[in-house]
Amino acid sequence: MAPVYEGMASHVQVFSPHTLQSSAFCSVKKLKVEPSSNWDMTGYGSHSKVYSQSKNIPPSQPASTTVSTSLPIPNPSLPYEQTIIFPGSTGHIVVTSASSTSVTGQVLGGPHNLMRRSTVSLLDTYQKCGLKRKSEEIENTSSVQIIEEHPPMIQNNASGATVATATTSTATSKNSGSNSEGDYQLVQHEVLCSMTNTYEVLEFLGRGTFGQVVKCWKRGTNEIVAIKILKNHPSYARQGQIEVSILARLSTESADDYNFVRAYECFQHKNHTCLVFEMLEQNLYDFLKQNKFSPLPLKYIRPVLQQVATALMKLKSLGLIHADLKPENIMLVDPSRQPYRVKVIDFGSASHVSKAVCSTYLQSRYYRAPEIILGLPFCEAIDMWSLGCVIAELFLGWPLYPGASEYDQIRYISQTQGLPAEYLLSAGTKTTRFFNRDTDSPYPLWRLKTPDDHEAETGIKSKEARKYIFNCLDDMAQVNMTTDLEGSDMLVEKADRREFIDLLKKMLTIDADKRVTPIETLNHPFVTMTHLLDFPHSAHVKSCFQNMEICKRRVNMYDTVNQSKTPFITHVAPSTSTNLTMTFNNQLTTVHNQAPTTSSATLSLANPEVSILNYQSALYQPSAASMAAVAPRSMPLQTGTAQICARPDPFQQALIVCPPGFQGLQASPSKHAGYSVRMENAVPIVTQAPGAQPLQIQPGLLAQQAWPGGAQQILLPPAWQQLTGVATHTSVQHAAVIPETMAGTQQLADWRNTHAHGSHYNPIMQQPALLTGHVTLPAAQPLNVGVAHVMRQQPTSTTSSRKSKQHQSSVRNVSTCEVTSSQAISSPQRSKRVKENTPPRCAMVHSSPACSTSVTCGWGDVASSTTRERQRQTIVIPDTPSPTVSVITISSDTDEEEEQKHAPTSTVSKQRKNVISCVTVHDSPYSDSSSNTSPYSVQQRTGHNGTNTLDTKGGLENHCTGNPRTIIVPPLKTQASEVLVECDSLGPAISASHHSSSFKSKSSSTVTSTSGHSSGSSSGAIAYRQQRPGPHFQQQQPLNLSQAQQHMAADRTGSHRRQQAYITPTMAQAPYTFPHNSPSHGTVHPHLAAAAHLPTQPHLYTYTAPTALGSTGTVAHLVASQGSARHTVQHTAYPASIVHQVPVSMGPRVLPSPTIHPSQYPAQFAHQTYISASPASTVYTGYPLSPAKVNQYPYI
């Protein structure tokens, strides 16, 4: 689609060209004139404002423009029909699209200067051409200026470069191609030259207060950019400098992560400052207009809100005010390929908060904050008001407060939300324009002037432009209620509306000091969708999760693609004869234009065709976007995506090993019966000194036998961590267990911060026979391989010191397994950009078939409360098209407050005790419908808070309310710093939930996990969690399950926290308990509360390990599915240097049915079955689970 300009008060006359022109376009432009236009493009005043001349037209129906970013191949053989705009009779111009596949495509104009007195925003690629809502008065002094045809002019100085200055005087502008207003006289196909690039003007996009925007082709490439040519009028020169400085500051941040437009460079052309931006597709206003101003569903408003709030959060952290946030300045990046992916544009009105001046004219009127209208001091909160107005407009399809004047604006606000507070009105410098004080009263109060009074004073007639008039904002929840929702979906919609209105009221708080902040907005339930946890079976909820998929962190291709680009360069321009080119160092090139070459040797998959969709598979979680992520520059990141196309992977084996940073390798379509394996980057197992060799991947590791087909999955050893090239990356992205040789010689914090992690890892990957052992599996049985980690106890003379410190251990689980259902040829992307010292916070279920993008997405929630009482739940939501149930449990506690109190003083106490890591989930066969009920009741566990609780200096809060879904008991973490023993329950209705996290010196408490009752089957599960926002929320970042990260306290003195890898069955099933009765674990406190056995519910399977595990290892328990008559297990053979010798006992207590007693079946597993191992840290034991229904390939 190409621009559609409506409302031009002119007609078109077409002239044949004098000469043939060579350009980026190879087709001609045809213009169609349609009469009876309702919109007028004429008129520009001191603020370049335009209103409709027609009295009967609503004042907020401007025209829309849409532009294609496709670029035809240059063809000099085709002539151009030159287009010149003349003033004339009323009509509007419809410019058909410029097509890259047909010579009938259109090009706007020829080598003529083209100027249009349209009034559009600064950087809007598409601007409405009727109403300019930032305007104040109407001046119809001129419509269109005609420029004589002339060839492109390039003025050269002595050095041969284009004359470039930052600021010019009025005298200079008179002879530099500018008119009296300072606008540059644009010429079609003119070449704009920076010091490094040349840009050919293709077409005019719009005009704003500070200049105009043109669509340009970057010569020598296939890139289309938008160039904003600022006016060189003295009144705009200063603001232009401010905009350049702000863009230069933003260029140091990730434009994709923080959702603002990417600026490429700044240069001077004929004394005009030119800003080069990425080309975006369509603004939200035109999107609304294209949809006939129909209301936008909340499930689409949510991702837009989240992305813009993320941008405002970054601006607030930088002390910047956007000051012109409106639908026209929120651009859809690529609606067809990335639905509702938006970016904030137009920083022409932006300023630093320290330079904010009262009574400054800021913001478009519809979105103007009360403090601006009243002349109060203001800050970044004005942007939050604007965002509230924007989302209200998306919800209503019409502006909430469409005031034709500032009086109408404050009148609308006061009628709906009440008068501003007395102290605000009294302090406002412009209050008396709109309010009168009742002097007769002993307590004089402000009252709003009547429309007649205001008109009598100012001569401005009050108008009523509202489509909806609300007595209060709560009434908005009743409008535009959808009628196509039934049952639970309608309940979901109502709950969603309640949260939306709640957030909207906080955003539209008249008092700016009480207005919600961007961080609080991102943590609001409407954004985090915690209020939807009660409807896990709803298809509407699933759709909400899928729509939020766009909010995930994006791969920063700049680190690998643009290293050869010009760095940030600023040439000071003291005079008009000095060149100035400023190259912004922020993602100089879009990822789809340049990508690393495909290289199977480095596991790099570059696919320029689909790389624009290359997102992180880490789940978005609020306030995580504040993390500045740094990708390892030594390893190329893949840019392909399985959702678009499946390409053969570089390895044609049945087993694919995906190291961190290279996750998401697609399985070959010819290997449907094989394994698509994802390496869980959970815990580096360090058993040697820091001088260990970095990880090397040998081809022998990937040469596997053809395993039986079926929906099978495997979790590879988490110790396979590093590639050689990663050693140069300084930001640590893995949690590491302290090696024994290092624990006694070096402080943890120093080792954590000063060394690259690449050299600390055990080179166990160099053993060719690592996976050569063949695992015999039934073809119909899926395989789950669990990994449990434990640190071996180091015998020292300071055991008593460890005992005294044991109560300070913090139970922490910072990693979970990801069990997803996906076709073998559809592997989700798993690339991730990582920042040092940022804790993993969330997880994601990504389930999609081949050539589709069906993603279930969830994210953590950082609660606004600062208490230690936190809640977590396992969310089970349906995920299409696969009905397979996936359960993910997230547990990530941050104990920064306690960790900051003390630095580690004992190197011995950094070792962990023998602890068993368990995960319990329910598992049951699924069906193809979304109404399969999980009949397991919730178990309440109370009264155990004093049984095994230790005396901690900080105390424990043992009260938590809610329904338990899943509880994970992670291993103990012993450190010298004072940390509470905390174990947050995933269900809020567990009284004394912290009993499961209390440990004696040599005892480990076991917790029973109960499966919460859900009213429907689920194929995706996300664990939401609420955390208190500590003072270091900037260190939070979405967790990519295949690349978990390590958390550190802000003072960099806290101990390491090891991440645990868990595997969960793909079917919902009954809870299981894992009590460990062994001398090394001391007294067991299982706190079991058996659930009522329903006819379809299996018995609680109990696995016992009667033999002492000693100090040598741990075991991962996976249970057989219900209804299975035989419970067989095959142990994978691993080399002795990998696994411990761990007894695995599965006695007759493992029953296939709750009605079958142990006497009916003999013991199917021999007691004291040993797996050949050595004292490393992990055990790999696979147990068959429920039969596979479909040929799915879960990824871990």
Swiss-Prot record:
Organism: Mus musculus (Mouse)
Keyword ATP-binding recorded: yes
The organism's place on the tree of life at top rank: Eukaryota
Subcellular location as annotated: Nucleus, PML body; Cytoplasm
Record-given protein name: Homeodomain-interacting protein kinase 2
Listed GO biological process terms: adult locomotory behavior; adult walking behavior; anterior/posterior pattern specification; cell population proliferation; DNA damage response, signal transduction by p53 class mediator; embryonic camera-type eye morphogenesis; embryonic retina morphogenesis in camera-type eye; gene expression
Principal localisation: nucleus
UniProtKB keywords: Apoptosis, ATP-binding, Cytoplasm, DNA damage, Isopeptide bond, Kinase, Nucleotide-binding, Nucleus, Phosphoprotein, Serine/threonine-protein kinase, Transcription, Transcription regulation, Transferase, Tumor suppressor, Ubl conjugation
Taxonomic classification: Eukaryota, Metazoa, Chordata, Craniata, Vertebrata
Tissue expression per record: Ubiquitous. Abundant in muscle, heart, small intestine, stomach, kidney and brain; and low in testis, skin and lung.
Active-site residue numbers: 324 (proton acceptor)
Subunit description: Interacts with CREB1, SIAH1, WSB1, CBX4, TRADD, p53/TP53, TP73, TP63, CREBBP, DAXX, P53DINP1, SKI, SMAD1, SMAD2 and SMAD3, but not SMAD4. Interacts with SP100; positively regulates TP53-dependent transcription. Interacts with ATF1, PML, RUNX1, EP300, NKX1-2, NKX2-5, UBE2I, HMGA1, CTBP1, AXIN1, NLK, MYB, POU4F1, POU4F2, POU4F3, UBE2I, UBL1 and ZBTB4. Probably part of a complex consisting of p53/TP53, HIPK2 and AXIN1.
